[in-house]
Design a protein with these regions (language model features):
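PLP-dependent amino-acid enzyme catalytic core
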Residues: 1-413
Length: 413
């Protein structure tokens, strides 16, 4: 595929709607990981997401006649707000089809820009079908969230800003991947200007459609999708974005929910800003890459792609961040039901912090406990596991068991 995006990105003017966001060094994260880690702050956009770039670039290139007919989009969040704000600036009608399960705060954000919201179905696939019906009836223009040349061009302006703002060598740029629009725009521009810079995509475990598609050399459809990083949770990537990624993306990384939560905490500690899970994917990817490849003294850029966090998720993020940093391990342990048994267990734990403790009566002879223990890393966790085994306490390491972390820790009695 010929790279036709470089010139169009150079000439794209998205700044009537989007902000030129800063590229900031993450002081604490860089020090901890012994690399120069920079954050492209797309969370500081007017709609708290990079999506405004692509939506506005698509819409400002529509004819007056098309703008008069209005635009339509389907989205559960960030793209919806981008289209709504772009429509407000361009003074055209906008209809956004959103799932019935969309949080009220996101619906209100879209409506605050004057867009009409249509609630339909439970999934984005159902919303897409409904949007096409409305489009045909009203003659409006569909603004695709990622699989569109002008949308991809708009997202690519991020890459242009990165190179303009940082003149020294960059080893890799990390991007979150959902449908593939963001990484396509960045990759196409970077490979045309600085092809030596690696482009690395990051997906959430259970929502890795691009990773699987690149391995299969064709677009795959996931049977189901993990919704924790909902802003990047899609069953299938775009046709155009897949072709671009095949040509220009160097590597894909998949991270789990705990790693995402830890990345949210990392960014908060450096910036006092809270990213949404999809917005922190790139940071989680940088950390995973450094650990896996044991590199230091490199320069990495991570795109902070969004900050439309649902407030009720903060407790979950805080709870899981320590596991993501390998600072907490979760065990199920069987102890004798007799006086002094818990004291003996605590002696085995030593001076380590017990972060949580749940007791369940099992029988007259034994009891089951669910315990969180502070550790320095998972190597220490393995040593503790062996120590508990030698004491015949039948320990089970549940640190990476999603069902246990979501449900068992809340059982009592």
């Amino acid at each position: 595929m010929k790279n036709k995006f470089k010139d169009s990105i150079d000439n794209a003017n998205v700044y009537d709607a989007a902000s030129r966001t800063p590229l900031e060094k993450q002081i604490n994260l860089s020090k901890r990981f012994k690399n120069n880690i920079l954050l492209k702050r797309e969370d500081l956009q007017p709609v708290f997401s990079f999506k405004i770039r692509g939506a506005y670039n698509k819409m400002k290139n529509l004819s007056d006649e098309n703008l008069k007919n209005g635009v339509i989009a389907c989205s559960a969040g960030n793209h919806a707000q981008g289209v709504a704000l772009a429509a407000k600036i361009l003074e055209c009608k906008a209809t956004i089809v959103m799932p019935k399960t969309t949080p009220t705060i996101k619906i209100n954000a879209v409506e605050s820009h004057g867009a009409r919201v249509v609630l339909h179905g439970e999934t984005l696939h159902e919303c897409f079908d409904r949007a096409l019906v409305i489009q045909k009836k009203e003659g409006s223009i569909f603004v695709h969230p990622f699989d569109d040349e002008e949308v991809i061009t708009g997202q690519g302006t991020i890459a242009k800003e990165i190179l303009e703002d940082y003149s020294r060598p960059i080893d890799a740029i990390f991007c979150c991947v959902g449908g593939g629009g963001l990484i396509s725009g960045i990759a196409a521009y970077i490979k045309a200007v600085k092809p030596e810079i690696k482009i690395i995509g990051v997906e959430a475990q259970g929502a890795d459609a691009m990773t699987q598609s690149l391995k299969a050399n064709k677009r795959v459809v996931l049977d189901s999708v993990s919704l924790f990083a909902e802003g990047a949770a899609l069953k299938q990537v775009g046709e155009l974005s897949f072709k671009i990624c095949q040509q220009y993306v160097d590597e894909m990384i998949v991270v789990d929910n705990d790693e995402i939560c830890a990345a949210i905490k990392d960014v908060f500690e450096d910036t006092r800003s809270i990213l949404e899970p999809a917005g922190a994917l790139a940071v989680a990817g940088v950390k995973s890459y450094i650990k896996k490849n044991n590199v230091d003294s490199k320069t990495f850029v991570a795109t902070a792609s969004g900050a439309n966090m649902n407030f009720d998720r903060l407790g979950f993020v805080s709870e899981r961040a320590e596991i993501g940093e390998e600072r907490e391990s979760i065990f199920a342990v069987t102890i004798p039901e007799k006086p002094g048994a818990f004291k003996d267990f605590c002696s085995l734990i030593g001076k380590r912090n017990i972060t949580e403790f749940n007791y369940r009566y099992s029988s007259e002879s034994s009891a089951n406990i669910f315990v969180g223990i502070g550790v320095q890393n998972f190597d220490e966790s393995e040593l503790l596991m062996e120590k508990l085994k030698k004491a015949s306490l039948e320990p089970i390491d549940l640190t990476h068991n999603e069902v246990a972390k979501l449900h068992l820790r809340h059982l009592v009695g």
